[in-house]
């Protein structure tokens, strides 16, 4: 979940991110208590700290702490690939689909980004492997979405604005959209997609909701807040 939290343009809420860090550190401490020998664990697995130390620690272990530029670039490419894979898996999990092999790879690849014994060739191979699992992650999500909502079909989408109150839904979580549509039936509130949620209009299952009326907004890069 933490990887998903930090994908590009997804979360600018500092308090939420700090809370996630704190929750992760607390969970890690509970797991360490169950570990019979912590001496074999890397420093990243053992570190803990308070909020005022987070920024200092980030400067010491962040992206630029990897001095070799080639290895640094590959580590970052792998990390961004894992962020995407975690997003695919999270959305698929919401629809009760999972792939334990993908979950195991996420853990293995994350650990590898901290392994200074690996060479450039090792990271090239891991980058390619990340791409392979990324495709499998997309296949998992596609199976989850089409299994729950049918196969997308050509659809004309209204881009106008109605006169009733409305809720805009962005992102990619079709399960969230479904629950919102169910809860707003008969309330006089319309539901619109925004930005990345546009493809939801193509799924047959959503066409039965009369208050799912259209899309509002342009591409996020062209909008002003």
Predicted regions and their residues:
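Metallocofactor- and cofactor-centric catalytic cores in central/energy metabolism, strongly enriched
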Residues: 1-224
């Amino acid at each position: 979940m933490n990887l998903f939290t930090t994908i590009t343009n997804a979360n600018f809420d500092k308090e939420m991110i700090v809370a996630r860090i704190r929750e992760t550190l607390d969970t890690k401490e509970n797991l360490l208590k169950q570990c019979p020998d912590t001496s074999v664990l890397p420093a990243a697995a053992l570190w803990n700290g308070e909020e005022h130390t987070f920024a200092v620690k980030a400067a010491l272990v962040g992206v630029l702490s990897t001095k070799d530029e080639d290895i640094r670039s590959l580590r970052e490419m792998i990390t961004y690939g894992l962020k995407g894979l975690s997003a695919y898996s999270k959305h698929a999990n919401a629809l009760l689909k999972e792939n334990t092999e993908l979950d195991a790879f996420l853990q293995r690849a994350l650990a590898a980004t901290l392994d200074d014994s690996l060479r450039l060739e090792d990271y090239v191979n891991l980058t390619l492997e990340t791409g392979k699992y990324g495709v499998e992650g997309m296949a998992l999500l596609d199976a989850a979405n089409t299994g729950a909502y049918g196969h997308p079909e050509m659809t004309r989408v209204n881009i106008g604005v109605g006169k009733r109150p409305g809720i805009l839904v962005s992102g990619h979580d079709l399960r969230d959209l479904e629950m919102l549509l169910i809860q707003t039936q008969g309330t006089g509130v319309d539901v619109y997609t925004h930005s990345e949620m546009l493809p939801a209009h193509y799924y047959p299952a959503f066409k039965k909701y009369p208050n799912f009326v259209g899309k509002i907004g342009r591409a996020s890069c062209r909008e002003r807040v």
